[in-house]
Amino acid sequence: MRIALFRSLGLFVLVFAIDQAIKALILGGFRWESEALSITLAFNKGVAFSMFAFLEGWLKYIQLGMLGGILLFLAYDRSFFVAHYLPLSILLAAGFSNILDRFIHGGVVDYVYWHYGFEFAIFNFADVMIDVAVALFLWQTFFKQK
């Protein structure tokens, strides 16, 4: 349990710090353009594809409550945490980083804009890490030998 907790905290800090450092660069004015991809600043007031933007200021508290619920569950079921600390650490770090954006900037700082062939939603490193965490969790659940 202690090793999992130590690794989890380290990974949490790493993912959180990388995401916030990239966002600081973007907020500082860094931009980049190409035919397929642009790095540009956008504030997402909703969640994926700007859904639930109508919740405005309440969304950050709802998300904070959801992450708090996950933490309470993990405190209750420590074996689940030990089995899945890797994706959980990534998920929580990315989630808390995006929630911090909502408190500080009024919306999530997004910056990666894919526009080759079709226009895709703008996203950030934390969003990618959430996808990675879900993929890892699914792999551990369905394919990892027990």
From Swiss-Prot:
Q: What is its EC number?
A: 3.4.23.36
Q: Hey, which family's this protein in? A: Belongs to the peptidase A8 family.
Report the protein's function. This protein specifically catalyzes the removal of signal peptides from prolipoproteins.
**What molecular function does GO assign, one term?**
aspartic-type endopeptidase activity
Q: Report the pathway entry.
A: Protein modification; lipoprotein biosynthesis (signal peptide cleavage)
The answer to whether the entry has keyword Iron is no
User: What does it catalyze?
Assistant: Release of signal peptides from bacterial membrane prolipoproteins. Hydrolyzes -Xaa-Yaa-Zaa-|-(S,diacylglyceryl)Cys-, in which Xaa is hydrophobic (preferably Leu), and Yaa (Ala or Ser) and Zaa (Gly or Ala) have small, neutral side chains
> Which biological processes are named by the entry's GO terms?
proteolysis
Membrane topology recorded in Swiss-Prot or TrEMBL: Multi-pass membrane protein
Q: Which residues cross the membrane?
A: 10-30, 54-74, 80-100, 118-138
Q: What class of enzyme is it?
A: hydrolase
The organism is: Wolinella succinogenes (strain ATCC 29543 / DSM 1740 / CCUG 13145 / JCM 31913 / LMG 7466 / NCTC 11488 / FDC 602W) (Vibrio succinogenes)
GO CC terms, sorted: plasma membrane
Entry keywords, A to Z? Aspartyl protease, Cell inner membrane, Cell membrane, Hydrolase, Membrane, Protease, Transmembrane, Transmembrane helix
Protein name in UniProt: Lipoprotein signal peptidase
